[in-house]
Every structure is written in structure tokens, then in C-alpha cells.
Amino acid sequence: ASGAARLEAASAGFGHGTANAHDEAAWLVLWRLGLPLDSALGDEPDSVANQPVTPAQQALVATLFEERIATRKPAAYLTHEAWLVGVPFYVDERAIVPRSFIAELLADGSIDGWLSDQTHDVLDLCTGNGSLAVLAAMAWPEVQVTGADISSDALAVARINVERHGLHERVHLVQSDALAGVPGPWDLILCNPPYVNAQS
């Protein structure tokens, strides 16, 4: 059976980067084969769908699907990668898989109107894996961003992402219970707090 059919038959849940079995199956196959996630999958001659796959590669893909189904872990935890607005982020079980409409608002400039020439310090409260802090620093090169989280584990993941994107001089990470350790003042506060329980 195809990977998508196997995921559907197992009633796998989606929503951590993909919305359906087909998209998640494509992501897992491309990732396991080391192919770009934006690879053409259609009938075009240059499509990776026409590329031969060795038995060893097939076995690796099958093992990944088996792990996804058996553990029920989001694919992002298996691949250690999640994407927001076309930007890749490292993720593991120390932080929630990032998903936020705020990322889209940062990317499309919707928040820009709230900034002024006097905007210098932005706080990303409940930063988790640091994705919104990184995206804010990318969107606003003249701004210093602080990512705060109560979890030292989440901050360790955020540190990986800040370094990965070369923003260690502009994104500072602080362990803080809400605003206790980051009293400000802040010109703008972003916040996408965890809203799922441990079972989700």
C-alpha cells in the first residue's frame, strides 16, 4: 500500500505541518530520501516521482512510516524539522511543533504597521522552539528580539534555531515565567502560548 494509504488506514493524526495523509507521506518520503521538500512530484520528466529508488531506500522509507504509525509522533519529531512560511526549523520533543498564524502575519508584513522608527525591542513570549523570534528578526533587521520561555528544554531547541539562522547577535533567549524575568519595556510583544495538553 502507498504511504498515504497506510497513514489513513492507521488513522494517523495530522496538523503538525501537514493537513492530510498525501502531503505527510510525500514529506516523509522526500525527507528520508534526502530530496528537497519542494521537489516536483507530477508526471513531468524531471519529477522525482520518476527517479529510481533502491531496495535499501525503500526499506528506510518503510521503517519511517512504521515508526510514524507505531509511535503516533508528529512527523516533525521524527524528521526533527518543521517549516513555517517556507523557513525550516529544528524541532524535537523538548518543544511543541511550531504552528502559528502569527508567522504568516510576520511574513506578509501585516504587523509592520504596528512598528515605528522607535521600535527597537521585541519580545516573543512563550518562544518555544524560537521560530517566531527568528521570523521577527528576519522581518525586521533593525530590531533586537528576545525570546522568553519557562522551559529550559524549549530554550535549548530555540538556541539551535537562532544559531541555524545566524541570528545569535540579534535574538537573545531568556528563561522566564511569563514576564517575571523580562520586565521590559518592550515596543512589541508577540505571544503564541502553548494551547495543547501533553496528550495532544
Where are these regions (language model features)?
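Conserved long hydrophobic alpha-helices within structured protein cores
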Residues: 1-4, 31, 90-103, 122, ...
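N-terminal auxiliary segments of SAM/dcSAM-dependent transferases
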Residues: 1-84
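Generic detector of contiguous secondary-structure segments
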Residues: 8, 12, 83-89, 171-179
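Alpha-helix termini
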Residues: 10-15, 109-117, 166
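SAM-dependent Rossmann-like transferase core, predominantly class I methyltransferases
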Residues: 51, 59-141, 148-157, 175
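S-adenosylmethionine
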Residues: 139, 143-144, 148-200
